[in-house]
């Protein structure tokens, strides 16, 4: 890596550590087959990545977002929260429906379990057979 290339990049990304992270991420993308935005000139991938950052053919902010996204194992999706007024109205309707369904047999729900039911289930478990594996 030429010092001139790194010095050119410091104007675009002020923190040298962040520059190394972004350039290494871009170099990995290039080695995985991403298209380069400048002439290679027989340079290796890290130098090409630094030259892309220095020539501003890639936005450091976009690279940073891509790096963060690549490191995330679970991406949270922002879902709109339900309106409290509609939840209250839905609760009132559900209460009226439950009075009508008192004659029907009770269905088993897996979401709710009392402590006694949990303890009874645990006591009913059969311990695994001992083996010489451990």
From Swiss-Prot:
Family matches, as Pfam families: RNA_pol_Rpb6
GO molecular function: DNA binding; DNA-directed RNA polymerase activity
InterPro entries: DNA-dir_RNA_pol_omega (IPR003716), Pol_omega/Rpo6/RPB6 (IPR006110), RPB6/omega-like_sf (IPR036161)
Keywords associated with the record: DNA-directed RNA polymerase, Nucleotidyltransferase, Transcription, Transferase
Domain of life: Bacteria
Enzyme's top EC category: transferase
Catalytic reaction list: RNA(n) + a ribonucleoside 5'-triphosphate = RNA(n+1) + diphosphate
Gene Ontology BP annotations: DNA-templated transcription
SUPFAM superfamilies: RPB6/omega subunit-like
Protein purpose: Promotes RNA polymerase assembly. Latches the N- and C-terminal regions of the beta' subunit thereby facilitating its interaction with the beta and alpha subunits.
Similarity remark: Belongs to the RNA polymerase subunit omega family.
Subunit structure: The RNAP catalytic core consists of 2 alpha, 1 beta, 1 beta' and 1 omega subunit. When a sigma factor is associated with the core the holoenzyme is formed, which can initiate transcription.
Protein name stated in the entry: DNA-directed RNA polymerase subunit omega
Species the sequence originates in: Rhizobium leguminosarum bv. trifolii (strain WSM2304)
Gene name tied to this protein: rpoZ
């Amino acid at each position: 890596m030429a010092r001139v290339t790194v010095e050119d990049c410091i104007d675009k990304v002020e923190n040298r550590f962040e520059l190394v992270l972004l350039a290494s991420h871009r170099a990995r993308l290039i080695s995985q087959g991403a298209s380069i935005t400048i002439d290679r000139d027989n340079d290796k991938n890290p130098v090409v990545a630094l030259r892309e950052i220095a020539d501003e053919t890639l936005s450091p902010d976009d690279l940073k977002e891509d790096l963060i996204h690549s490191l995330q194992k679970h991406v949270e999706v922002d879902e709109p929260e339900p309106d409290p007024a509609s939840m209250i109205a839905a609760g009132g309707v559900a209460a009226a429906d439950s009075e009508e369904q008192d004659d029907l047999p009770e269905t088993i729900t897996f979401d709710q379990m009392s402590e006694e039911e949990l303890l009874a289930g645990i006591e009913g478990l059969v311990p695994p057979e001992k083996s010489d594996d451990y």
